[in-house]
Amino acid sequence: MKFLMISSNFFSIFATSNCNLMKKFLFFLTALLCVSLAEAKVSLPQLFQSGMVLQRGKTIPIWGKADAGETVTVTLNKKQYTTVADEHGRWRVDLPKMKAGGPFTMEVKGEEAKSEKLVIDNVLIGDVWLLSGQSNIDVTIERVYPQYTQEIDTYENPQIRLFRVQNSTSTHGVKDDILPTSINWKPVTKQNAWLFSAAGYFLGKRMFEKTNVPQGIIVNSWGGTPIEAWISADSLQRDYPMLVKRTAFYQNDEYVKAQMKANAEANKQWDALLNEADATQDYIRLDYDDTNWQTINQNNWTWRGTGTVWLRQHININKEHARKAARLLLGTLFDQDVTYLNGQEIGHTYYQYPPRRYDIPEGLLREGDNVISVRFINKYGAAHFIPEKPYMLCFGDDRLSQNPMPKDVIPLADTWKMHIGVEMPSCPSGDVSLQNLPTTLYNAVLYPLAPYALNGVVWYQGESNTGNPAPYADYLKKLMGCWRDRWQDQQMPFVIVQLANYDGRQQTGMPRPITYQADPVNSGWAQLREAQRTAAKADPYAELAVINDLGETVDIHPLRKKEVAERVGLCFDRLVFNDKKVSLAPEIISSEVQDGKVVLTIDQPVLAGTLYEFEIAGEDGKFVNAEANADGNRITILSPLASDFSPQKVRYAWKDNPVKANVRSLSGLPMSSFEMVINRK
């Protein structure tokens, strides 16, 4: 610790000149000394908290800050490790490899007598996994609960710890630490996991069952973000300097604050005007006369305005169901809604994606006529119901489950009474969205995590890049490269979760009918899946988790996250634990022409039979559908054209939503979509 050195002559001169000045100076000196003492405290990053999991079998870095030159001692498992803070106050010790175990207590202390000792208890040694990406990592246990009700209700495991990185951005370069978070190494219980990543929860559970050692799950994701936000400036600068310049524009903090304030004020005023013009609450009353309202069918509703629109549906409840607790499933809606039953609000959702699951308290449903009133608030695009979702009242002890669906249900009708509340111009944007700018998330929430020892990384992202898939493979290569550089581990394992199947024509502001895409299309989702496939294939320390059968046609956030975690776990079984017995998704090895037929060789046997979603192209580059059959590890594709047709390329499952794709391994894993030039010997 550094002390202020002030001569006695200085004090005597100061005292004789002015007593009041002397008092002020002593006050200043005391304050300065307090600051000096405060700065002398040894500190640790936010990752280091009680309950944490440290990585087994690898060197364990522990780091933090102290006064420059101060000696810092770290004690773990009754062993001491000492280092000295550098000229910038940074210190680090590397603990030797440890076996799985615990709980242990870790103590960190400076050399000075007044230095506060930091005590971190309940520390486990096991496996630590980092999950990053966008909203499909964000999807919580709360969201998927109806898919796995019994499992989530009953499963607890203090050996699995959950850590959620708090969202933050930086346009001014890298940060030293992340922000404090409320989910800080919490043990797995239903309550602790409720707002935690479902993919992370199930990965921890799966890997614990595999290894029987403690599991630490760090989730670091942000919905809607592109991959560029997660890559370092140094990695982008050479090949994509304009991306770095785009972020530099937002380094003007005053501009950003002014823009955010203006947008927020415009949004606030829009809401105020909306509520002033549509202030009536009469429409929620059971006895309101809606006979003169227009009747619409939710499956072909044509209103295209923005503002508010009211919908009402009467439903008859028999004596058996009257006064019982229930759950209303109102599918998903575009965009916002406030929903009432018999004049009482039962739920609201302020954006389009979450499923509407509204619990009805006991006593609210009455025998006879009841009315559901929905106030749509639509700030842009066209208000609509998302098809293929459940719209019903659910009763009984299993009413919270959707896998299977409850036994006692009353389906809602497709028809509603409709009345326009108020029509408004589209609402202005309320967010500058710094999280979508290149480098901002790498700077703020990725860089500070290193060098915390990890066993592997899950990258589950891509939806926000489907509009421009061409550079994605290179972006992904740069992301894996700069993260490995940051951890100084060029063999850091990555599992890339490929995009699921999805048809986005309904989850947009201008919905279009969902019909099967029978003809070949130039799919942005397929192109991005191909970028993920080729990037993973080119990297010896990466694997691809194929999930093109786990999506939902009308939902960009499919619920089957346990199955996603299982496939990620299989990849880690091979990549990290070197389990040679594990079979992953079938992978295309080669393609060639034999006797006028295109023959594909796969890395393993696949289920035999007729196959779908194959296309071939001739010299003109135009793809056409083709029949295919599987036998062992070979797929034979028959040309649908004339005998002189010369196939040049073949591709598979080349659609946003390739619902008929059916190439599977003998264990049931689906093959990735691909496009390949045919080898012509």
Residues covered by each model-derived region:
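Ser/Thr-rich low-complexity repeats and stalk/linker segments
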Residues: 41, 49-124, 382
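Surface beta-strand/loop "capping" patches
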Residues: 46, 55-58, 303-307, 327, ...
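Aromatic-lined ligand-binding clefts that engage carbohydrates, nucleic acids, or primary amines
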Residues: 63, 293, 315-343, 372-374
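Beta-strand-rich ligand-recognition modules
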Residues: 78-101, 332, 339-392
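C-terminal beta-sandwich/jelly-roll accessory domains of carbohydrate-active enzymes
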Residues: 80, 603-681
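Short, aromatic- and glycine-rich surface loops/edge beta-strands on solvent-exposed regions
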Residues: 102-111, 373-374, 647-654
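Short acidic/polar inter-strand loop motif in beta-rich domains
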Residues: 111-118, 377-384, 654-663
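An acidic-aromatic loop/edge-strand motif
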Residues: 118-187, 218-300, 369-443, 447-452
